[in-house]
């Protein structure tokens, strides 16, 4: 099960009826000059959901790969994100991203980080609601929003976020936050779904990989998928891209899902949204 030529990727229906492929491809830290080639490889492997951000500085490469692919636009799901330093000018920032991507519309637009010290994410959200109303975005959401950020945003929002993209992997699951989002009707999307590779060496994961003839990454991604979580693993290697996509064919038992869940250790791999500023992003 290490590779797959044709894998049916499940979808998640967002709270506005839009369907998002549950297993996507992320381009965080992919160099701009390599992005087109890498995204072309991902599209050829079978990915139809691509996740980028203005802060990654590789939207143009994503757009070039889309244009070169010949894949009908309606078959693709493209996510990008609002830069932290542009929360006060979200409308123009979105137009810049859309043009860099070479697209008439974007499927999902996220506030990348709350940056509460700026006090601007509610203003940004109101601007995004207008873009959504004008049909330039099919769904709007947030990223890295903790419970208190949601508590600030939701009373001022006319539109409920469709997605909250947060760090989740076996050793850092944010179970309470994920449950809160799901209870509100906000889909949960995991970045760093493999714990930046650190979770793949766990004995439980390696044992299940041997049992299923799968890669450790496929086991961890299957664990995410079993819980309805959207995932966006990244790789710069075409073979690994195909392997990761094959996770959709791995079905774990409830007991095996629980075994992986027991790996929780509170080991955050990325920045803490409560204090992260990243104003330069």
Regions flagged by a language model, labelled:
Residues 114-281:
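Beta/alpha (TIM)-barrel catalytic core signal, keyed to glycine-rich beta->alpha loops juxtaposed to Asp/Glu
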Residues 30-33, 53-61, 83-90, 116-119, ...:
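Acidic-and-aromatic substrate-binding clefts and catalytic sites of carbohydrate-active enzymes
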Residues 1-76, 127, 195, 265, ...:
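N-terminal binding-site loop/beta-alpha segment at the start of enzyme catalytic domains
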Residues 14-15, 41-43, 63-73, 95-104, ...:
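Acidic (Asp/Glu)-rich catalytic clusters
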Residues 81-83, 87-126:
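Glycine/small-residue-rich loop that forms an oxyanion/phosphate-binding "nest" at active or ligand-binding sites
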Residues 30-43, 86-101, 148-151, 172-173:
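Short, acidic/polar
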Residues 49, 105-108, 139, 163:
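Residues at the N-termini of beta-strands
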Residues 5-12, 60, 64-67, 93-98, ...:
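Alpha-helical scaffolding within the catalytic cores
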